[in-house]
Amino acid sequence: MEKESEIQSLPPTRRYTISLALPISSLNVAYNLQLKTSFVWKISRIVSLYGIDEIILLEDPEYVQNTQVHTLSSDAYLKDPTKFLTDLLCYFETPFFMRKELFPLNPHLKYTSCFPLLPLRNDKASTVNIEFPYREGIVTHPSPQAKNKYIINAGLSHNVIVSSPSVLAPRTRVTVRLKAQSPNEEGQLQGDIVSFSAPREKGGHYWGYKVRSCLSSQLCKSSPYKGGYDFVVQINSQTSAITSKELEASLPSSFRHAVLVLQDNVVQKELVDSTAKSISFNPFPVSFLNDPIPEEILLAAMTRLSDMLLMHGRR
């Protein structure tokens, strides 16, 4: 009860970030397209439920080469696991109304319609929420009435018109902040383009995740955040189990950018070359006869870590 009251008293903003480093070899748990799609959806759902802001696909050149050589499928994307994972992770995160514009039909998207939409943002709402006026949208075309104005489809009953000093190409995805006013004479709402992180930083609302890839040895060096990652959690189901009290004691007093590294045999060969605070823990209290699969490891880890990260993240 004491921890719940502490969490409820936290300010309604969130400047810290949580990233997940996922080895592309994790895709080995599934042996056909339908199961691979199911695996990616499960990862996407766990990531969205626990407010993870970034997914980093860790590449191992030897694994990629072996996959390309031994994959017999006619689908070229299955020969490139990084491309396959990136496409599906981004597809599941993208609002439904803009998927057709951003993702042309491809064989590897065949089974994506079998899975429910992720519980993200306010994508399903068709009206403006005055208390939280952010929306994801897609550029449709420049406004014919004014220079540097663009029409945005934000999944609402009215389009949104925004200003931009730089050129916005059609089908560009943007985050907009709607202004509190009625539609203009053309039936358009007015808004401003803001950063993807604005809803999280200003209002504390989880707004989805970004996806990037890098070599496993370049994980911390390639961080997109200023100052890089300052807290690294290596999740390894092969290490000794620790209690929740021991786990919380090992966390830093505060952090800005945490990265959770989901380990497997490939990643364990690479050293995380960083000065960041680093811990390694086994999310399971007991050992298993069979190794748990990646989504089980991630879910178990977030079950134990989520409240602790919430308490220690800088706001």
From Swiss-Prot:
Keyword Magnesium: no
Enzyme class: transferase
Species this chain originates from: Schizosaccharomyces pombe (strain 972 / ATCC 24843) (Fission yeast)
SUPFAM superfamilies, per database record: alpha/beta knot (SSF75217), Nucleic acid-binding proteins (SSF50249)
GO terms of biological process kind: methylation
Keywords noted in UniProt: Cytoplasm, Methyltransferase, Nucleus, Transferase
Signal peptide (from-to): none
The protein's name: Putative methyltransferase SPBC8D2.16c
Cellular component terms per the entry's GO annotation: cytosol; nucleolus; nucleus
Molecular function via GO: RNA methyltransferase activity
Location relative to the cell: Cytoplasm; Nucleus
Family: Belongs to the class IV-like SAM-binding methyltransferase superfamily.
Annotated PANTHER family: CLASS IV SAM-BINDING METHYLTRANSFERASE-RELATED, METHYLTRANSFERASE C9ORF114-RELATED
Record EC number: 2.1.1.-
Pfam families: Methyltrn_RNA_3 (PF02598)
InterPro entries named among the record's database cross-references: Alpha/beta_knot_MTases (IPR029028), NA-bd_OB-fold (IPR012340), Put_MeTrfase-C9orf114-like (IPR003750), tRNA_m1G_MTases_N (IPR029026)
